[in-house]
């Protein structure tokens, strides 16, 4: 499996730790779409880069990290076909995979500690989409464009 990872300047250390963690624990290839610099970096750039890599099939899933996880997830969710969830605890991360078939995870380097971030990543990576009623009731509705 290939995982795309992106970040802004706030989350360089988190990105590196999570990247190494995933490679060591799961043996997945993790492709960097973020910055390695502490110089100010505009988070939407890496959020959209990872999202585009997911929808284009360059990677299977994406993880994005900024200060709160919110801004970078909003940038990712602009890309058609992306379902990026911002999580600050493992339970929501796991259920986002099981019920909503999320294909991207976001979290904040200023919100969660690194050990909790690893737990969130574990819950999200091991969660499997259940389909069934979740597909009928949720994903079809979520995937339809809103008409005004």
Protein language model features and the residues they cover:
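N-terminal beta1-alpha1 ligand-phosphate binding loop
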Residues: 2-18
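Short active-site oxyanion
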Residues: 2-3, 59-62, 81-83
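Mid-chain, well-packed structural core segment of small domains
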Residues: 65, 70-106
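Short, glycine-/small-residue-rich phosphate/pyrophosphate-handling segment
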Residues: 90-134
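Conserved small/polar residues in nucleotide/adenosyl-binding loops
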Residues: 140-146
């Amino acid at each position: 499996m290939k995982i795309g990872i992106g970040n802004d300047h706030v989350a360089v250390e988190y990105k590196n730790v999570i990247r190494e963690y995933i490679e060591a624990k799961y043996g997945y290839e993790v492709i960097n779409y973020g910055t390695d610099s502490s110089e100010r970096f505009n988070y939407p750039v890496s959020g959209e880069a990872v999202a585009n890599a997911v929808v284009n099939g360059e990677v299977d899933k994406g993880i994005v990290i900024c200060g709160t996880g919110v801004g970078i997830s909003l940038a990712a969710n602009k890309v058609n076909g992306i379902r990026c969830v911002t999580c600050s605890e493992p339970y929501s991360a796991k259920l986002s995979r099981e019920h909503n078939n999320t294909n991207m995870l976001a979290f904040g380097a200023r919100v969660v500690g690194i050990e909790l971030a690893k737990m969130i990543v574990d819950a999200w990576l091991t969660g499997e989409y259940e389909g069934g009623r979740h597909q009928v009731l949720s994903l079809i509705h979520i995937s339809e464009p809103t008409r005004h």
